[in-house]
Amino acid sequence: MKDPQSPNESFDIIVIGGGHAGCEAAITTAKLGFSTALFTINLDRIAWQPCNPAVGGPAKSQLVHEIDALGGIIGQLADETAIQKRILNASRGPAVWALRAQTDKREYSKRMIEILQNTDNLSLKEAMITELVIKEAETFSNNLKNKTKKIKGVKTFFGTYYYAKSIIITAGTFLEGRIWIGNKSMSAGRSGEQAAQGLTQSLHNLGIKTERLKTGTPARVDKKSISFDELDIQPSTASDKYFSFDPKIKNNMPQVSCHITRTTLKTHELIRNNLHLTPIYGGFIDSKGPRYCPSIEDKIVKFADKNSHQIFLEPEGINTPEIYVQGFSTGLPENIQLDLLRTLPGLNKCKMLRPAYAVEYEYIPATQLKSSLETIEIENLFSAGQINGTTGYEEAAAQGLVAGINATRKLNMKDPIIFSRESSYIGTMINDLITRDLKEPYRVLTSRSEYRLTLRGDNADRRLTPLGFEIGLIDERRWLAHKKKMKSLKEENSRLENTRLKCTDEIAKKIELDSGSKIKGSTTLKELLKRPNLHYSDFIRYDLVDKTLPISVIEGVEIDIKYEGYLKRQKNNIDQINRQSLKSLSSEINYDQIDTLSLEARENLNKIKPTNFGDASKIPGVSKADLTALLVWLKIKELKNEKKTSFAEKKLSS
């Protein structure tokens, strides 16, 4: 073995973990020209979907659109490997419309591996990283001596040392992971794969604290043993919809149906009688699980008045018999799991291929991170994905992209890219993570955003693709396609605004008859489209629109016009927030004297001494409530100063 001071290999950036966060981070840094190594415990399980074989859903699809708009990869792969697509919340407003894709999990992983293997500047390595290597230096600030810690590299389980200028940890559920079935447990990051040992202790030694969370996954059953004729069918209804804005992305996968069954009174009785055998209710573990993806036993306990719960049966791929039993995760013993499954209609003779299990793991509370996802404690150490306390492939991928972007910018001595709540769901999620003391896995939700009508999936490219191009992740071909779309949107909006119909026109009479809505004198097509009972599909029927216009342009224009008033109000709110962000903060402010601030906010504000309100809003531990309190305090202070000035002027004049 080489001396630890003599590295086996050197890289600009090392990514630890090959899940969805790690893949986005590694591809990002390599595409931006930095030599990158992606380390993972198992190279055959890169970008694996250990739980639900699906991408998207409410708020999650918006995240995927945003990642793609910036130049990330998850949206393209989800589109290419989708075996079913549906639009969720289609009957509601566009702010909550959500695309969801059932993917072929093996095909998804295979294609991601191919992309990684063919990305310039990127090396793949199978090894367990057990130690972070740092170098310490002394700095002076305000005549005070400070010790700083900066990343130098990593060591593997077998003692090999790799040098790196920057590290991104994307370890998922693998840090000291332990899976549970009933009262039996074993060390594992997920079923069939060993946990990551040693790295947690290395983090502790460097001053980064970790805590424990829990998640779980349901059983997989053999589709040949299911009576599908007893189940409700759920076909693919949106195969023409895409996460990616790249016009070259296509899907050639066969489309399949999912099916729906329900729990029965017998299911509930069996669960209640065996609650004491589960890891949580039996007292074997006390880690918090995800609120929005509860186990079936949690549902039975917390919603005791419900006689039945919907369960979805989802194929894991085209060439596998495995069916994912969505909504039925459990920690019950294996033999009871099979009995439980057989209480469900259509599954009374089912064969279980893999049992459900719970997994608990170490995570890094994200209040220890900056908005860039760099750790506060150690320079050039970034953290992204489930290790930051989130749940979901989409949340992980978004963080991986952000960490990758900012790791490269730090090495280039550029300011980090900070995503604001007003600009993206990515920004909403990161702001929530670094300012809230979360004690359960975090899932992105549309309700978490104050600007959800502005932050839709369909306009993610309008919001973020210029930034992706500026960073260097959107290539010239994508950029030209984006500019062409923007031109089409502008031209179509202008055409609708300037095309008038007279009430005497034949087509106007037909519109009046069909819609039951009178046209007085004359009106523009734009004004017509604002009416709730008229849509672009009607314009196409009346031959009032170019039928060759892409669906993305048609949808974008219609939403912009129908919700114009709401969008203007939301834009005004955002502009006001942006103006507030420029409000200066004196370095003389003693935040300990502002009683309305939380203790953590006072401590961090005093430590960092932000120069303006915008910088204060990016400090970990400073919540939205703290920012409001600070604004009120500043306003009161301004009023007091105005009164003092006015009083002094009166004295002088007298």
Swiss-Prot record:
Protein residues bound to FAD: 17-22
Pfam families attached to this UniProt entry: GIDA, GIDA_C_1st, SAM_GIDA_C
Keyword Flavoprotein applies: yes
Alphabetical list of SMART domains matching this protein: GIDA_assoc_3
Compartments where found: Cytoplasm
GO MF, one example: flavin adenine dinucleotide binding
GO cellular component: cytoplasm
SUPFAM superfamilies hit by this protein: FAD/NAD(P)-binding domain
Family stated for the protein in its record: Belongs to the MnmG family.
Protein name: tRNA uridine 5-carboxymethylaminomethyl modification enzyme MnmG
Provenance organism: Prochlorococcus marinus subsp. pastoris (strain CCMP1986 / NIES-2087 / MED4)
